[in-house]
């Protein structure tokens, strides 16, 4: 955010909105939102970010996508789609893939959430050794999570 606030970043893409303090010092976030040439938000609900965004794309809820999430205690769990997407809604990873394709920074591929998670586990040490198989039904702690998270 500081780089956007200083004007060295031209665009911000938010995958969720929320109160400004969610993204850092509110004054810096506000200045960043004012200084960027383009602000895009993917979300389900209105927020201070949506009020400033140049483009608001329809987001999806956890019930409309497959993937994983990591809770605040460092436990990674699977989420499974139980609702069908409607209209032009897309999962965040699809939006980012399409944006990357259009900007020429990502090759045209059709990844899936499991492959994306596999790449994350290869690239980020805290997720090393985790896979959809090791997550199972109860999830698993990332490296460095506390013992109470590891036990469940």
Model regions: which residues?
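Non-catalytic alpha/beta scaffold blocks inside enzyme catalytic domains
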Residues: 1-131
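Long, compositionally biased stretches
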Residues: 45, 130-152
């Amino acid at each position: 955010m500081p780089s956007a606030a200083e004007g060295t970043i031209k665009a911000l893409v938010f995958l969720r909105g929320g109160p400004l303090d969610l993204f850092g010092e509110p004054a810096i976030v506000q200045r960043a939102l004012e200084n960027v040439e383009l602000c895009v938000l993917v979300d389900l609900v209105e927020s201070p970010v949506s009020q400033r965004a140049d483009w608001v794309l329809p987001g999806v809820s956890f019930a409309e996508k497959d993937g994983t999430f990591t809770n605040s205690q460092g436990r990674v769990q699977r989420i499974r789609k139980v609702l069908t997407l409607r209209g032009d809604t897309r999962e965040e990873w699809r939006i980012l893939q399409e944006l990357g394709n259009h900007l020429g920074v990502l090759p045209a591929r059709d990844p899936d959430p499991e492959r994306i998670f596999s790449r994350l586990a290869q690239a980020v040490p805290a997720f090393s050794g985790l896979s959809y198989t090791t997550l199972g039904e109860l999830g698993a702690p990332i490296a460095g999570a506390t013992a109470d998270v590891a036990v469940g």
